[in-house]
Amino acid sequence: MTRMVQCAKLGKEAEGLDFPPLPGELGKRIYEGISKEAWQAWLKQQTMLINENRLNMADPRARQYLMKQTEKFFFGEGADTAQGYVPPSAE
């Protein structure tokens, strides 16, 4: 049976994650209140931040930055955007 959550990011009821995606309290909050759809949107945003900012994930500061961005994306005012990113136009 599919687990449904009231998604804090999307503001609607949607399919929940199968397991906490991160360790600790933040992972628990995401598991309890974020949908699969919103998590997939975060993975795309996270990839852009890593690539555009050339983050080295072996660097603890880069990992800490991403954890803060994760929390802001789901529960705050929104994560940073990649500087200079222009979304492709639909032609």
From Swiss-Prot:
<dbReference type="InterPro" id="IPR036766">
    <property type="entry name" value="Fe_traffick_prot_YggX_sf"/>
</dbReference>
<dbReference type="InterPro" id="IPR007457">
    <property type="entry name" value="Fe_traffick_prot_YggX"/>
</dbReference>
<dbReference type="GO" id="GO:0005829">
    <property type="term" value="C:cytosol"/>
</dbReference>
<dbReference type="Pfam" id="PF04362">
    <property type="entry name" value="Iron_traffic"/>
</dbReference>
<protein>
    <recommendedName>
        <fullName>Probable Fe(2+)-trafficking protein</fullName>
    </recommendedName>
</protein>
<dbReference type="GO" id="GO:0034599">
    <property type="term" value="P:cellular response to oxidative stress"/>
</dbReference>
<comment type="similarity">
    <text>Belongs to the Fe(2+)-trafficking protein family.</text>
</comment>
<dbReference type="GO" id="GO:0005506">
    <property type="term" value="F:iron ion binding"/>
</dbReference>
<keyword id="KW-0408">Iron</keyword>
<comment type="function">
    <text>Could be a mediator in iron transactions between iron acquisition and iron-requiring processes, such as synthesis and/or repair of Fe-S clusters in biosynthetic enzymes.</text>
</comment>
